[in-house]
Amino acid sequence: MKTYNPNEIKNIALVGSAGSGKTTLAEAMMYEGGVIPRRGSVSAKNTSSDYRPVEQEYGSSVFPAVLYTEWKDQKLNFIDTPGADDFVGGVISALNVADTAVMVVNAVKGVEVGTEIISRHVRNLNKPMIFVINQLDHEKANFEQTLEHAQASFGKKVVLVQYPVNQGLGFNQVVDVLKMEMYQWKPEGGKPDVLPIPESEKEKADELHNALIEAAAENDEGLMELYFEKGSLSEDEMRAGIRKGLIARDMFPVFCVSAEKDMCVRRFMEFLVNVAPSAAAMPGMLTKDGRLVPYEVNGPASAFVFSTTIEQHLGDINYFKVVSGTVKEGDDLINMTTGTKERIAQLYAVAGKNRTKVTELRAGDLGATVKLKGTRNGDTLNEKDCDYVFPGIKYPNSRFRTAVRAVNKGDEEKMAEVLYRMHEEDPSLLVEYSKELKQMILSGQGEFHLNTMKWRIEHNDKIQIEFYAPKIPYRETITKYAQADYRHKKQSGGAGQFGEVHMVIEPYEEGMPEPTTYKIGGVDSKMSIKGKEEYDLPWGGKLVFYNCIVGGVIEARFMPAILKGIMEKMEEGPLTGSYARDIRVCIYDGKMHPVDSNEISFMLAGRNAFSEAFKNAGPKILEPIYDVEVLVPDEDMGDVMGDLQTRRAMIMGMDADSGFQKIKAKVPLKEMQRYSTALSSITGGRATFTMNFAGYEKVPSEVQEELLKAYQETDDDE
């Protein structure tokens, strides 16, 4: 295989909703480039992309698949991404290293919520975007409506390069308004007959050709002057203008194909070769410290790892983009995250399940290596003395959580190892043992996401696991002042234990004045502050601790023990065993014994006094609240709003968004359990949502009563 330079490499992310035909398009392009001898199909479970057992089981891409083909002396690297919203992590990984996004749209379904969501990731990462309207051979294909939806969503930047003459059953003709030719295919597809545009299409083609010229000229002042001077542009001039428009995201060209019948695929590949920006035409990658590293062969060797898969007989396969210099087989590179040396023992160009050994890969290229010791997604690998470090990949917050356990208790440790390994492959899958909840918690993008993970564990690792309801990380706090005292006394023949603590507790609020007077036993008592300690609690909120002891009734050396007792009780609040927060404590009196007082005595006295005071201070349970944004088609908005209101949602607003509605709401985490599944059911899978932690709020009184009752029943059972 030839070694390619940055100006000969095109890195393309194939993105789009599930069922749009990305994998089928990738198969056709690899077949046309001669990388595979025949085209596989999703239904036959023999594509290069979806080769893993879980993908064949579900008939859907689960991981991003790195592929390539060679065409007209250039290398086209493709990353075939999952279409299901549950696997958006793979889309984001791909877009981080792609130079162009190809948005594949189903001509039957048109622009879907998935199209909208993915296009936002494309925009956020500032990638050029090309539309490919696929499945034009389907009897219900509607190119005009799909185009109309695209233009409504993305504006005048959406510009036709091609349109179908006879969409639907029997589709085999396309007019290309860049080259001003018509293509016609035989039933087997592949290479078309090139024909003059028929008279019946001439007026429409001329109009679209002129629109394309104007769009191309708008992206370059020199081309605009040429256009005004000549009244037209040559093909090469149009290509130059389209390329500039693509890179600036001022133009989204539209192509039409039938990937399944291999129609218009070759012409699309020609466009990618001639017009899509090469790695050399793109700015490069920014380091964490803001340096722009261009894709240049003469720089130091530096690579960015964007994806990892684990295969049974090979172990870890790390996929990377060469950002600078040349990576060669046998190189020793430094992992800039861990500081360890990694040997590139084997180097591959990858076409899904097919790997071709190569001796080197140059800047801008994508490749893979195996058996690295500790390299993960987002790591930078550099030659010695190179200090580039590229930012890691940012994935969206989780939207679905569950608790998980092994059916056989003896498999718990092995299950945990497998789960953490899966997180290395898919960083959007989060795994955590919660000491607070005493559960192993899995978080992901949806129920489908976690179900595919469960299938893999049970079929690949032979461990039976079960999902069950995750507990909610509630918090406890107080709403009013309370006073309590507690004497701990114990005699056992020898040295005894004695400690007495008097305290006041009250709700803590940011900026509140220092305590000066408290009403104790009906009398106003002045406080004399001898010491103050303020703690930002690991679980959120604050504890402020005052030593207001007068006359040495408790020696200062026992204050840390009292504080320790309070902190221990705050780790397991008196109401439901949840963490307590936002409390101010003042120790104002107490007693010691010259012989029997010790640290354990004051720790227990402090703990019990705090517990008693807490129960009398108007205790309340706090629940986690999330900011939720739902993107939903107009026609489903009423049903989605109604469902949110049953979930105790506070609707914060609504915005129209290109045929969709964006609903903003604050919703308790407890009510978001299985929401991704419910939303899919309500809208037929046409809506999506995001959720971000907003803070804690007091639960309604009826909810508090339910929680207290449930906790008491659990306590009684134990």
Describe the role of every protein-language-model region:
Residues 1-718:
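Structural and coupling elements of P-loop NTPases
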